Amino acid sequence: MLMHDVRPLPLDPNLLAILQAGSPTLWLNPHQGEPLPDFAPTAADLAEAGARLHRCAGLLAELFPELRPLGGRIASPLQPAEPLKRADHAQAGAWFVKRDDALPVAGSIKARGGFHEVLALAESIAERHGLVSAGADRRALASGEAHALFARHTVMVGSTGNLGLSIGMLASALGFRTVVHMSADAKAWKRARLRTRGVDVVEHAGDYAKAVDAGRRQAAGMPRCHFVDDEGSRMLFLGYATAAAELAAQLAQAGRPVDARHPLFVHLPCGVGGAPGGIAYGLKARYGEHVHVFVAEPTASPCVLVQLASGGAHPVSVYDVGLDNRTEADGLAVAQASHLAGPLLRAQAAGVFTVDDRQLFAHLLDARERLGIDLEPSAAAAFGGPAWLAGSEAGRAYLRGRGIVPEAATHVIWATGGSLVPAEEHRRFQARACAQRRESGAGA
């Protein structure tokens, strides 16, 4: 049933019918390989983002004891995921899960972009006020003098939850006054966690876009206020892109080459598009045509799919095709794609597959039972990626058209959050997933 008025869009009628029915699908991007837009980040931009996180590692280790075992690096394990394979996908290459759900402090992929943007801001303010020079030890940013300086500044962000956690944890630790505008989709425990860190949480009855807009408007009227714009921030995007170097080192250590004979498939949950767009950009810069990035969106919130499939020239919302943007995947409940990441994904994403809430909870159960990983629903969205390629006509056509031998491929499924979720929430997720499986068995 359609929940919003439908706006005429240049969408294929068959695709539109599938979207409006809420049916999971795989859409292949015909624009992959087109030239990047002029505003695309440069190689120097990527290098500087990596250098910033490296020089600030000591600072992060000082601020957060959880990061000391990693020397302050924002890094997550790459876990073999062969137990996820079903009998019908047994020959589909080597599978891994990228465990950003286990990232310390923020507990999600958003630590990569969020920490990078806050660190860039802190460096800029401190350099302007003479607290640090270009080559100085960044641990000086944790000094009392720096804390007093940052306390005169505000950091503000709009979020469905995880980006707010990332920004809020680091900005407040450095001393910034921090304000997070949270949409109705945000979980109560995320709001509570921020408040215990002294973060001002502003709750909104509307969706993600309304929370972001409210934050943007408030920030515009405040002196010394930096707004982290999830819909268009280059600093967030570049922070996500740094994950490519980390993954490349892990794949090399695992003995998985990436080249014409050994393609890499990366499956990423997608909300507004910044995190998957940044990671795709970093991977494409490193591997070119040998990496194939597929993004996963809820059937109720396929904002990137709708944007790309409609041609990409003008902003398009899932509301324009009659969808309601309501899903248990709170981190992916976004109605309109990023105006920064969208055009970059248009040129670089291999495709988009959608997942309904029942599939999300089935994937959650698989992650728990087969890999011993507890995830939040959003983080499980990409687990169906390899199956779409092996088990659908569109997926098999994609492989055939590129001469890809499935057995030679490496699949990386990005798990984006879950380690900070309270135990009671995890029990609720698992109970729902188990009940759903029992119902499916009874109806079989």
UniProtKB/Swiss-Prot annotation:
GO terms for molecular function: D-serine ammonia-lyase activity; hydro-lyase activity; pyridoxal phosphate binding. It catalyses: D-serine = pyruvate + NH4(+). Gene3D superfamilies: 3.40.50.1100. InterPro entries: D_Ser_am_lyase (IPR011780), Ser/Thr_Dehydratase (IPR050147), TrpB-like_PALP (IPR001926), TrpB-like_PALP_sf (IPR036052). It is an enzyme of class 4 (lyase). Its cofactor is pyridoxal 5'-phosphate. Belongs to the serine/threonine dehydratase family. DsdA subfamily. NCBIfam families: D_Ser_am_lyase, PRK02991.1. PANTHER family: D-SERINE DEHYDRATASE (PTHR48078:SF9), THREONINE DEHYDRATASE, MITOCHONDRIAL-RELATED (PTHR48078). This is Probable D-serine dehydratase. It comes from Burkholderia thailandensis (strain ATCC 700388 / DSM 13276 / CCUG 48851 / CIP 106301 / E264).
